[in-house]
């Protein structure tokens, strides 16, 4: 009898995972262009589309010491939205070929109610001012690198929390002066949350980047230690 109950419990967990997305590999925010969006399915209806994200090629030969890395390239990614997420569906429907800020999840196992592992759970039109959610126009945390520390004028294009057992914050920033993008990590959770809020605005800001000799568990040796809307990052403050 006990074995039967365990079997039923496992069965419920299995199907619940399949229908409602069993686990999440990563979740974050990104600036995305909406290329396609439509309704699909009969039994399990969902909304499916294609977004375009900024990215780069790791094969590019460039000099990081001279801030020449990397040239911006574009990547097309299929995504899904659940039909009960009406507000997001409606905004995406009227935003074809436009840039939005999206909140997304990448699932480890594709749900039978969705046609892709990338699920958009929220979409926003970019603000034209500093987000009211921010308590200050700058945030500074401890530097983690001793190789280089510098300021970049631009904005964050993508930032997500990745991993299942050991998670890290990984992102991509745009250097508007040089017209380059570069991957970076965030080792401070408060900074990651602050960065996510700044992404809701189209305003550029100053990003403080600390470069370490080693990456540790994170994917990039570039670490974000400051976001500043009023002055270059890395200044001296009392």
Where are these regions (language model features)?
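Flexible glycine-rich surface loops and low-complexity tracts that mediate binding to linear polymers
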Residues: 93-113, 197-219
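Short boundary/loop segments of OB/S1/cold-shock single-stranded nucleic-acid-binding domains
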Residues: 19-26, 132-148
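OB-fold/S1-family single-stranded nucleic acid-binding modules
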Residues: 107-135, 212-238
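OB-fold (S1/OB) nucleic-acid-binding surfaces
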Residues: 44-79, 166-186
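Classical Sec-dependent N-terminal signal peptides that target proteins to the secretory pathway
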Residues: 1-21
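Intrinsic-disorder/low-complexity, polar/charged segments enriched in Ser/Thr/Lys/Arg/Asp/Glu/Gln
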Residues: 27-29, 76, 99-101, 149-151, ...
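Structural detector for short beta-strands of small beta-barrel domains
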Residues: 26-43, 147-166
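N-terminal post-signal-peptidase region of extra-cytosolic proteins
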Residues: 77-90, 182-200
